[in-house]
Amino acid sequence: ISGENLEEVPILAAPACEGYRNKAQYPVARKNGKAYAGFFKEGTHEVVQMDRCRILPEETDRVKSIVIDYVNKYNVPVYDESTHRGLLRHIYVRRGAVSGQILVCLVVNGDGLPKLPALIEALKAVPGFTTLVLSVNTKKGNAVLGDKFVTLYGPGYIEDTLCGLNFRLSARSFYQVNHAQAQRLYETAIAMAGITKKDLVL
């Protein structure tokens, strides 16, 4: 780097290669009359349907499937980026790696969703489901979350523990998506810096 010969350091491999990611954002689309969710095709905004993503916990994909079933059952309008019409834009799911608590955030191009009691009851079947939040995003563009959040069920946040500290996590909170590797990163940095409980770190 910059002409310097740096000492090689060992790579700390992640303890898990599957099921580790604690956050997912699924864009929603409709094709042939049926709603589906997945991820954008590389370099495009074309949504590719995905039933199971192996880097996510099974509960996260289960939430996505429940929401899509609800959308199809009650014919909830799906957002169309080309016309800026429709309602549901994204399904956002966050799961505490330690607590197992799950936050579901639905991003909408409007003020609400129909038949919410039915959706909430269906989500209660998912172990760890804690809260349902609405994010209102009526702007054109690539931003997923909007500026307005409405709590529809539960406290509006989940809790989780990292490096012995407890955190409240909302849909807007920054939190490393690989919990186990983040903890190893912080612990390694503390050890290399020789930080003790008596030190004040700025």
Regions found by a protein language model. Name each.
Residues 1-202:
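Accessory RNA-recognition modules of RNA-modification enzymes
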